[in-house]
Amino acid sequence: MGIFSIANQHIRFAVKLATAIVLALFVGFHFQLETPRWAVLTAAIVAAGPAFAAGGEPYSGAIRYRGFLRIIGTFIGCIAGLVIIIAMIRAPLLMILVCCIWAGFCTWISSLVRIENSYAWGLAGYTALIIVITIQPEPLLTPQFAVERCSEIVIGIVCAIMADLLFSPRSIKQEVDRELESLLVAQYQLMQLCIKHGDGEVVDKAWGDLVRRTTALQGMRSNLNMESSRWARANRRLKAINTLSLTLITQSCETYLIQNTRPELITDTFREFFDTPVETAQDVHKQLKRLRRVIAWTGERETPVTIYSWVAAATRYQLLKRGVISNTKINATEEEILQGEPEVKVESAERHHAMVNFWRTTLSCILGTLFWLWTGWTSGSGAMVMIAVVTSLAMRLPNPRMVAIDFIYGTLAALPLGLLYFLVIIPNTQQSMLLLCISLAVLGFFLGIEVQKRRLGSMGALASTINIIVLDNPMTFHFSQFLDSALGQIVGCVLAFTVILLVRDKSRDRTGRVLLNQFVSAAVSAMTTNVARRKENHLPALYQQLFLLMNKFPGDLPKFRLALTMIIAHQRLRDAPIPINEDLSAFHRQMRRTADHVISARSDDKRRRYFGQLLEELEIYQEKLRIWQAPPQVTEPVHRLAGMLHKYQHALTDS
């Protein structure tokens, strides 16, 4: 496909984006808004953002959800801006500096919350800065400006949503149904690989792919939940399926690890059974029916616990899968499965990374302020706004540098494109609203196609072009003002990019170590006799951390294996019949405190000391288990955990 070719699947969204822009433009001028540009810009960003992220037309609900987040972020930013102005109106420089810190604070929060919700906090940060900078000539008009800005943004969001509904957005439901079928087959094939106990790298690749696919299915569940309330039952089932899928991965990998030391546990009966190849979900269904009969015949005691648990989880998965596909009423059996253990939320391992993002945003905004005050440039304020926008939005993404480059390319492309509209097209459409709408629709259509291709600079070009062409009421054509705005955007993006390069993010290794220590803490916390604590579902949180580890350290198999081993240890110890007595309970609390100290230690020396203390406590704990005559189901997992921690103590403690 050529660089300028138009694929059929890209046309519908391009028309949708053009419609959103035209609607916002028409409504903005019809209601005599002072700056309809904000409504048009909002409609374009809300519609195009999800398409750029998805690499195609976004699924139903994505644009509505992004619009909802934009409204929340705008209102938070407007309120913060008003509070800052009221408190510091007599000290303008201090007011701007506090706004820079506010933008950094919002970026810090957006780095810690869920990626889906971080957009609202990023927006809140630079909205306050925009308000404070814009009202500098006339501070008494602050409330009016804040209200107008909120109104224009809400109009833009409503127009984007109307355009989305008008062109029947894609439903993700069919994709979810297909993935559920395919995922079950992949789970069965992983168990086959683990029982064969073949090449470790093949197994690593298989379970790594399944972790990614399960995480992707969880993202599809979020999209389905946003799409319509009629999928509420399917959403509940999919939430439980996420845990079941992770359980299947864990049991399969434990089956593989068990055979490293005790291959005789997997009998020839099960080896022969899992030799049968499967291609479809129907094949898996037949095999599971046969497998349940084999287990009933051999007995639970003669069946390896990992295979028994795997079959139970796969059976529940099948039952819930049928419910998701049909979206029927939840029956009593399903309700029993759905009334599972409460999920545990873990503390973010990226606090240092979030602090780096705070300083990047704050310093870049302060640098923009100094540049503005030093040069006295009329478009210094525009440069500051772009600095805040780039840093606030770039910091929450995995590769901030590439986002900044995208904005630089976009603002550079916007200069000639905006020049064409400013000098030729818009002046010649002054007498006709229809011609003005058509001209902007053409812009939205072609940039909408490029956005779906994820062309570098396409998203920045769309926003920057709309921002610099004259869409005010009334329209005024001052070339110097246009040139200042265009150059201000470019300078702001370059300054933001410079700060991102200078303030290096070296938090990757620290984040990896914190993640590994959180896995250790989770395994240690599973050693408890507290009934409520044993019922807590840590599995989704643990695999979410594993997924983050896989993204931070692609290809680092030793780290992945260590993390997976800790997850397996957690699951095994969680179900182990630990003797109930006060002596062991007190020691469990002591070990949990020590594990928490390992995570929170600021220096390597403290971390090594606490880790050594944890290893000593595990030795004492094993002796206590022997004294209290704990069964092998308890002593063996604890012994394996202690051995793993001894083996990898340097990786878990050194920076």
UniProtKB/Swiss-Prot annotation:
Induction: Positively coregulated with aaeA and aaeX by AaeR. Disulfide bonds: none annotated. Keywords: Cell inner membrane, Cell membrane, Membrane, Transmembrane, Transmembrane helix, Transport. The keyword Transmembrane helix applies. It is found in: Cell inner membrane. Pfam families: FUSC (PF04632). InterPro entries: PHBA_efflux_AaeB/fusaric-R, PHBA_efflux_pump_AaeB. Signal peptide: none annotated. One of its GO terms (cellular component) is plasma membrane. It is a multi-pass membrane protein. One of its GO terms (molecular function) is transmembrane transporter activity. GO terms for biological process: carboxylic acid transport. Coiled coil: none annotated. The chain crosses the membrane at residues 13-33, 38-58, 69-89, 93-113, 121-141, 152-172, 370-390, 407-427, 431-451, 459-479, 482-502. Belongs to the aromatic acid exporter ArAE (TC 2.A.85) family. Forms an efflux pump with AaeA. Could function as a metabolic relief valve, allowing to eliminate certain compounds when they accumulate to high levels in the cell. NCBIfam families: PRK10631.1. This is p-hydroxybenzoic acid efflux pump subunit AaeB. It comes from Escherichia coli O81 (strain ED1a).
